[in-house]
Amino acid sequence: MTIHIPTWVNGTLQPVEKLEAHLRGLRHKAISVFILRDGDVLLQRRAMGKYHTPGLWANTCCTHPQWDEAGVDCAMRRLDEELGVKDVPLRYRDTVEYRADVGGGLIEHEVVDIFVGEMPSGMEPVMNPEEVMEVEWTPLATLAQRVEASPETFTPWLHIYLRKYADIIFESATDA
């Protein structure tokens, strides 16, 4: 199935095939989700079959909305598809932009809607092995140190989020 994502071409938002957007480094829409619980953040290790950054640790969920799909709807859909997570309310935090080389001649140039949710105790993710090979609850207080200690094991965008946008993402993140 060919997936078309909202991409800016010559200043106009248009549906462009996802791989083409990455090969050309075109600016496109994306979402990122951070699920928290009791001071921890849920990280996922990307499946080895992913076409870029396989086997690297990332935030809870990140993807691209399909053409004409709202960011929050996309976030909820992918939480379910990747991690079997349903019915966790998400709060929009902000929209940020970054550009990163993700290897293999691919560039992520994303305008990202960031969402944060709180997973209740007793609820656990159920990994889709085509998308996720491992999950881990990591203390928010030590996440940046862990990424700094082993930078090659984390996605470029997680580095960027922690370096440039952590205050936006995590400030009052657990408030109702």
From Swiss-Prot:
It catalyses: isopentenyl diphosphate = dimethylallyl diphosphate. SUPFAM superfamilies: Nudix. GO terms for biological process: chlorophyll biosynthetic process; dimethylallyl diphosphate biosynthetic process; isopentenyl diphosphate biosynthetic process; photosynthesis. It is found in: Cytoplasm. It is an enzyme of class 5 (isomerase). CDD domains: NUDIX_IPP_Isomerase. One of its GO terms (cellular component) is cytoplasm. Its EC number is 5.3.3.2. Its main location: cytoplasm. Binds 1 Mg(2+) ion per subunit. The magnesium ion binds only when substrate is bound. Binds 1 Mn(2+) ion per subunit. Mg(2+) binds at E82. Mn(2+) binds at H22, H28, H64, E108, E110. HAMAP family: Idi. Catalyzes the 1,3-allylic rearrangement of the homoallylic substrate isopentenyl (IPP) to its highly electrophilic allylic isomer, dimethylallyl diphosphate (DMAPP). This is Isopentenyl-diphosphate Delta-isomerase. It comes from Jannaschia sp. (strain CCS1). The gene is idi.
